[in-house]
Amino acid sequence: MEDDFKHLVRISRKDVDGNKTIEQALTEIKGVGISLSTTMCRTLDLDSEAQIGYIADEDVLKIEEILENPQKFNIPNWMLNRREDYETGENIHLIESDLDMTLRDDLNRMKKTRSYKGRRHEAGLPVRGQRTKSTFRNSSSVGVKRS
């Protein structure tokens, strides 16, 4: 059984440590949390506590297929990280660099439309209504410095 062990497993453009459990290893992929990794293990009938270095190549391909199209495998929409996409209106799940680019595009769209959230992002201030009297003083916001 030692011959089948892989120290690095490549899943969706990400090298994952083979010594970790399947559940933990899947959470190393950006865009995959613990609930999605648990659901993926249950969908594929994999032991979530087994080391990912021992799983077969076919199972790795199935994991990648679930990450590409989770709705095909009846993953609920509330587990997806991009529900009702702004441009397409579809429910999709993004991982790794696709997630980064989409979030950056969303921020740029908010800044371009000069929405409240966009202006707060531009100024480097908190966006979600936190108080700023005593906190966020060391952030890199643009302002006047006293000498």
UniProtKB/Swiss-Prot annotation:
Chain intervals for the UniProt region annotation (Disordered): 115-147
InterPro entries assigned to the protein according to its UniProt record, in alphabetical order: Rbsml_uS13_C, Ribosomal_uS13, Ribosomal_uS13-like_H2TH, Ribosomal_uS13_archaeal, Ribosomal_uS13_CS
> Keyword Glycoprotein: yes or no?
no
UniProt keywords (A-Z) are: Ribonucleoprotein, Ribosomal protein, RNA-binding, rRNA-binding
| Alphabetized Gene3D superfamilies for the sequence | 1.10.8.50, 30s ribosomal protein s13, domain 2
Q: Where is the composition biased (Polar residues)?
A: 132-147
Q: Does the keyword Cell membrane apply?
A: no
Q: Which domain of life is it from?
A: Archaea
- SUPFAM superfamilies linked: S13-like H2TH domain
Its Gene Ontology cellular component terms are:
cytosol; small ribosomal subunit
One GO term (biological process) = translation
Q: Can you provide one Gene Ontology molecular function annotated for this UniProt record?
A: rRNA binding
- Give the transmembrane ranges: none
Pfam families linked to this entry: Ribosomal_S13
Q: Which PANTHER family match?
A: 30S RIBOSOMAL PROTEIN S13/40S RIBOSOMAL PROTEIN S18, SMALL RIBOSOMAL SUBUNIT PROTEIN US13
- Cite the HAMAP family for this sequence: Ribosomal_uS13
Q: What does this protein do?
A: Located at the top of the head of the 30S subunit, it contacts several helices of the 16S rRNA. In the 70S ribosome it contacts the 23S rRNA (bridge B1a) and protein L5 of the 50S subunit (bridge B1b), connecting the 2 subunits; these bridges are implicated in subunit movement.
UniProt lists the family membership as follows: Belongs to the universal ribosomal protein uS13 family.
Subunit annotation: Part of the 30S ribosomal subunit. Forms a loose heterodimer with protein S19. Forms two bridges to the 50S subunit in the 70S ribosome.
Tell me what this protein is called: Small ribosomal subunit protein uS13
What organism is recorded for this protein?
Methanobrevibacter smithii (strain ATCC 35061 / DSM 861 / OCM 144 / PS)
